[in-house]
A protein has these predicted regions:
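Exposed, low-structure sequence patches enriched in small/polar residues
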Residues: 2-263
Length: 263
């Protein structure tokens, strides 16, 4: 569902999604202590389902130079499996919230975003020690400054703190990216950009796998500090004298909101 007020320039986009799996095939094992034999097999189970609710909203502040953006993405999922021969229900709660203060005036475009993500797992088997929770915090500061001679300077400063993971996977990191671009040709359709990524060399990529059988934290390899030279060309395939900006105005209307789901 999308709502937009032309008078206040406020926009709201809400979504909901759900999933239900019947007769899901899961593995199961049974151990016979008298013979020492463990038998493996499969069983069809019901009870796997999920639901999610979220949305995005933005509203300009008085003066139109500042704006606030709010993003929500919350979900619940239940997965059913067997630990040995005992059935386990794993309830997975996830909350993701973010708030952005953006400023745009003249040649300056900057935004400060705060983020919080909470994930809690509750298992029907085992003790309360098997019910774990993680909390991730983030602060992003993105800036772009348009300079004379068709130059533009951009930077991204992103701090992340991950807590509640397995030993060795809790960490704080600061990611810094800096770039300089030059636009040329008629209509500035071509851009050369030189950008340095992960200037401090601190980036890590950790993620969590959750199922009815286990919870695991894993880290994948990344490139690390590097630099790239980009060439960007914007194709204009509109007929007549129409331009991409003309088509954007038609799609959005006078002062309309960004496309659905993007703010």
């Amino acid at each position: 569902m999308s709502l937009f007020s032309a008078k206040s320039q406020a926009a709201l986009n809400l979504f909901v999604h759900s999933n239900l799996t019947e007769n899901n095939i899961v593995s199961k094992s049974e151990y016979n202590p008298s013979t020492g034999v463990r038998t493996f097999g499969y069983e069809n189970v019901d009870g796997n389902w999920s639901i999610g609710l979220g949305g995005f909203g933005s509203i300009p502040l008085p003066g139109k130079k500042f704006s606030l953006r709010l993003g929500l993405n919350n979900s619940y999922a239940r997965s059913v499996g067997f630990v040995g021969s005992e059935r386990n229900n794993a309830d997975n709660w996830t909350l993701r919230e973010e708030l952005t203060l953006a400023y745009r005036f003249g040649r300056l475009d900057t935004s400060l975003k705060g983020m919080w993500s909470h994930n809690k797992i509750v298992n029907s088997l085992g003790s309360a020690a098997n019910n774990t929770a993680t909390n991730d915090y983030g602060l992003h500061w993105d800036t772009q400054i348009s300079l004379p001679l068709n130059l533009a300077l951009e930077s991204q400063l992103r701090y992340t703190s991950m807590n509640g993971y397995a030993s060795g996977y809790n960490y704080d990191q600061t990611l810094v990216n800096i770039g300089l671009s030059y636009s040329f040709l008629k209509g500035k359709v071509a851009t050369l950009r030189f950008k340095v990524y992960d200037l401090l060399g601190e980036q890590r990529n950790v993620y969590r796998n959750v199922s009815a059988l286990a919870i695991s934290s894993q880290e994948t390899n990344i490139i690390g500090r590097y630099a790239m030279l980009h060439f960007i060309y914007k194709f204009n395939s509109f007929s007549g004298n129409a331009s991409a900006s003309d088509m954007k105005n038609v799609r959005r209307g006078p002062g309309g909101p960004p496309p659905s789901g993007r703010f």
